[in-house]
Amino acid sequence: MTDNWRIWNKAKDYGDLLYKRAIGDLDEMESSKALCRVLSSFYEKRMKVLDVGCGAGHYLRSIRLGIDEDIDYTGVDATEYYVNLARTAFGDAARFLRGDIYNLPFEDNSFDIVICNNLILHLPPPPIKPVSELVRTSSKYIIVRTVFAERNYIIKEVRSSYEEKQGLPIRDGNLIDSKGEPLVYNYFNMYTEKYFRDIVADINEKIDVKIVPDDSWSSFDNTALAGKTATKVISGKQVSGNLLLDWRFLVLSQK
């Protein structure tokens, strides 16, 4: 498998957008607010929290505003540019590291709570290894926000905009190579509740699994900020391009 799906090193504009949310120049993401609602149900003072796929630190801003201003927080992201933005936003008030979800740079049970928002769907299938790493580094709770579906779908969203912004001549007719592989793409995978329950049981059958719908958000439209395929609300449903998004939280508790 190629690394053509790792688009974020080229997506500096997206990192800059997250940075503006982290420092308060833009509103909090609805997913950040939803995370806080789930997290607040079991968070206690002095718990250590790891944020996997932390971006530019925008989730930390929401957690500080909604839960604990002095939270013991560590953020990790595979994209160095995003990590540097997060360090700029928060200085020494939080720890941000570069690291990969497939091999997190922490010992077993290093954190009370591990959170992972909006990342699993963008990883190559199957998500077993990433989820097992989240479980490994947590001593108590894991929160994963991702898209669910009635069937399992492996989706490749073919991209060209990053190359176009760098002045490279990418024509739509040349987006897919002779072997059927997109030149640049990101995954947008959707899995069933049963699939997640089964892989968690394979990792550790003693883990308690709870599915929490993420449907308590205000109406919004991100297309002005992030383009015509950005997430928006239509008739009470979140939509991205042609995809209907059933966001839920996978909440795992270690027994």
Locate the predicted segments by residue:
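Conserved class I S-adenosyl-L-methionine
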Residues: 1-43, 143-172
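Class I SAM-dependent methyltransferase "Motif I" SAM/SAH-binding loop
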Residues: 53-55
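Class I SAM-dependent methyltransferase SAM/SAH-binding core
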Residues: 57-102
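A conserved beta-strand element that flanks and buttresses the S-adenosyl-L-methionine
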Residues: 115
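A short, conserved alpha-helix within the catalytic core of class I
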Residues: 123-133
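Short alpha-helix
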Residues: 185-204
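A C-terminal cap/extension of S-adenosyl-L-methionine-dependent methyltransferases
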Residues: 198, 208-255
